Amino acid sequence: KDFTEQYVLGNLYEILLDESGFDADYRPAGGSSENHQAIVNGEIDLYPEYTGTALLTHLGLEFDSTMDADVVYATVKDAYAQDFNLAVLEPTDFNNTYVLVMTKAKASELGIETVSDISTKGGDLVFGTTQEFTERDDGLPGLRETYGGFNFKEVVRSAHAQRLRLLNSM
């Protein structure tokens, strides 16, 4: 996947596989959809995937609020075996969760303390994100469906590494 933490994970997997006697070659292959298609097509052998991404994006399944991490993992593991003939390995301790970040000054100025506040006061905000987040069910569309609103003055799409610079420039 094409962002910093994935570059780190990819290189870590390459090192661990090499040290375990495998001849591993890490090659970034794009975003979630590109990596998924590449593994289904046999173009790559392994890549780190998030169970939430697998559930919502690749399998097109709905998240149910009663599903904990173990249920999501089991659902993804079973469906990947059945639908794609792919083995989902045991989860690592690595975790990635989306959060919304804004400066304290801007939050104070607009009276924003919760995600619900952002949903109703977004008209004054410029939202920096990736193209993928604007399209994913667990991204901006999911926020809009869950909270309503989330209509920003502007949505600026940028690479992951550029968002901190964007936030600091405001």
Regions found by a protein language model. Give the residues of each.
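Second-shell loop/turn segments in exported
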Residues: 1-3, 23-26, 62-64, 87, ...
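Extracytoplasmic "Venus flytrap"
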Residues: 1-11, 30-32, 132-135
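Sec/Tat-exported extracytoplasmic proteins
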Residues: 2, 16-21, 42-43, 48-54, ...
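Short, polar/charged alpha-helical segment
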Residues: 4-23, 39, 141-145
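Ligand-binding pocket segment of bilobal, Venus flytrap-like solute-binding proteins
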Residues: 44-45, 123-170
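A conserved helix-loop-strand patch within extracytoplasmic ligand-binding domains
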Residues: 69-126
